[in-house]
Amino acid sequence: MKQYIVLACMCLAAAAMPASLQQSSSSSSSCTEEENKHHMGIDVIIKVTKQDQTPTNDKICQSVTEITESESDPDPEVESEDDSTSVEDVDPPTTYYSIIGGGLRMNFGFTKCPQIKSISESADGNTVNARLSSVSPGQGKDSPAITREEALAMIKDCEVSIDIRCSEEEKDSDIKTHPVLGSNISHKKVSYEDIIGSTIVDTKCVKNLEFSVRIGDMCKESSELEVKDGFKYVDGSASEGATDDTSLIDSTKLKACV
């Protein structure tokens, strides 16, 4: 079930984020030829329109932080019949990405999802766009193949959260010189899945928000293994599943942050 929180002011303290830094590995790979293996990827697209009175800030990709929380320690009070701790009491790790740029701090959380390997941003006036995605095989990034059963479980269990706050960061942009890499997931019409979890929006600086998530096979078109979810917050009203990710942003204007 989705949880939407709209902040009318910054009265609430920002949510604490875990503290262990996770570095992603990178190695070249290619699409597997095995029939029951799939390179699953994720594509997250977000468009934020800031409030009219918000100062224009075109400094994108000011900083990107990746943090993975450790798996929580099992409850010592809960034991199985053989006196060992039940694995069901261990929460899966969540990876957080904090992107500062364009006068915003965008915090994303990913649990049981495909790995994020590419992060990019663009800004035009009071509009800030961002994209977080996996990278399809053959582009110099590691992309492990998993079974069909594992892919279906990933589609069912993946959860993405977002927390957008105002930022007064003044440091310069740190745009990378390499091209923006992508997931190569098809953007055809597919069924909706409940992927987006909690969404927090600070209306002190955010006027409108459109947010799209798509998961699919990066090497083979398979409607069974491709789903999407969407969220809109426009003019004070929230709605689910209505975002058209094919025309949400102009991807050609994105610049690589990592």
UniProtKB/Swiss-Prot annotation:
A GO term from the CC aspect: extracellular region
Domain of life according to the entry: Viruses
Positions of the UniProt region annotated as Disordered: 65-93
Record's subcellular location: Secreted
InterPro entries per record: Chemkine-bd_vir (IPR009173), Orthopox_35kDa (IPR003184), Pox_vCCI-like_sf (IPR036540)
UniProt KW keywords: Early protein, Host-virus interaction, Inhibition of host chemokines by virus, Secreted, Signal, Viral immunoevasion
Signal peptide annotation: 1-17
Induction record: Expressed in the early phase of the viral replicative cycle.
Described function: Inhibits host immune defense by binding to host chemokines. Binds host CC chemokines (beta chemokines) such as RANTES with high affinity, but not CXC or C chemokines (alpha and gamma chemokines).
Subunit relationships: Binds to host CC chemokines, such as RANTES/CCL5, MIP-1alpha/CCL3, MCP-1/CCL2 and eotaxin.
Protein name: Chemokine-binding protein
Native species: Vaccinia virus (strain Lister)
